[in-house]
Each structure stands twice: as structure tokens, then as C-alpha cells.
């Protein structure tokens, strides 16, 4: 199964909502429970963000194989973030492909 990479920042309210959405999706069970997510803190792990340089501005941003699947936008509420995180999880697919 492919891994999602989520670039985030400590203290970011949109990142907190993305984590909340991930927890909710995993709690549903099934394929969502198995989706691996690699969390990268933009401030503490700058070297790990280098492959994504120029591909995002806002956090959280979610990537799969270097392709951006989601980038939060100012003002997004939990429902919008949940829908976008779910879309990213769905992109992984149950067999590890899109």
C-alpha cells in the first residue's frame, strides 16, 4: 500500500483538524484503518520537506509519490478538511494503487 505524506506544523489549527479527520477515518475501520501516513513537521524536519519544495505553501499538505493531493486553505472548516483528507485516503485505494 502506498504511503501518504502529510506536511504539518505544530500549533497549526488546520493540521489539528486534519489529524482529527485521520483519527475519524481510521476509527471507521476497513481500508481507512490501514492507510499509512508519514507525518513531517515543517519546522523540525526541514530536510524531509526538501522533496516538496515549491509544491505547497499552506499546511497541512498531503502528498502521495510526490504528487500533491491536498493543501489546506485559510478559512477551511473541519468538514472541508475531513472531505479532502478522505479524498486523499481514497486515492491510496484498497490495493495500494489509485
List the predicted regions and their residue ranges.
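Residue-level recognition of the N-termini of beta-strands and the immediately preceding loop/turn
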Residues: 2, 34-38, 98
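Non-catalytic, surface beta->alpha helical segment in thiol-disulfide oxidoreductase systems
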Residues: 58, 64-97
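Thiol-based oxidoreductase modules, predominantly thioredoxin-like and allied folds used
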Residues: 8, 32-47
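Short, glycine/acidic-enriched loop or turn micro-motifs at the edges of active sites
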Residues: 11, 44, 68
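A short, structured beta-strand/loop element
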Residues: 52-59
